[in-house]
Amino acid sequence: MVIQELQEIVKKRIREKTDHTYLQTHLPNPIVDDNKLLLTISLLLEAKLNERDIIVYATTITLVQIALDTHELVTNDRMQMGSEIDRQLTVLAGDLYSGQYYKLLANVEDIKMLRYLARGIKEVNENKINFYHQNAKNVSQVIDLVKNIESSLIKKLGSYFYLDEWNAFIEEFLLLNRLEIEQNNYIHSNQSKLVDILNDFESDKLEKNMVLDKYRKMTLSQLEKHIQNIPKINEQLKEKVDQLFNINSQQQMYVEEG
């Protein structure tokens, strides 16, 4: 089965497990990050798992990520301005998605994976607290917080299957993915918590639309270096990396023209 088919099966499973009529009348449907899903499936293929296990583990990791993202919405400024019932339902939705992944792993009786994911969840939440409370002392610490928020879960998956040589690539790939998302958010809404925090540390106070561009260039350089350390990378993931490089070039032209 090709990677695209595995991705579609996992996304179908996610839709089935997050389907809740009442919640969907009040909240947007959960969003699957296609780049994280591709990276997750790529790791599981590298671990030589069969298709059934790939689908189970990829669905589990994606549900965990959705649960964490959903709970994070409660701290979002726009959510704070919403109704109390929306905030309560958002917490409830996050709990519902969390319960689904516990159920999945319980069915395959993988207690060891539960422990690994619990550590990953703890790391994500600790780094989110430090990020939103702006506890970082410098730009390097901010970038490390974002890397850990984005990559801790998938790195734990890699560690579980003894694929730690992927860690540096995972960090840079998902950091670049997040920077791209933040850039798009900023372009369309003129809002980005990450842009604001990074800009606070800029001594020369760049134009805000230039801040993420600066760090994307640095991340691209690191990603190009670390991809060489992956023994074998599938064509779909390689194409996605190339696409991120191309997106960066296009966005750089947009920034320069703007």
Language model feature labels by segment:
Residues 1-258:
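All-alpha prenyltransferase/terpene-synthase fold signal
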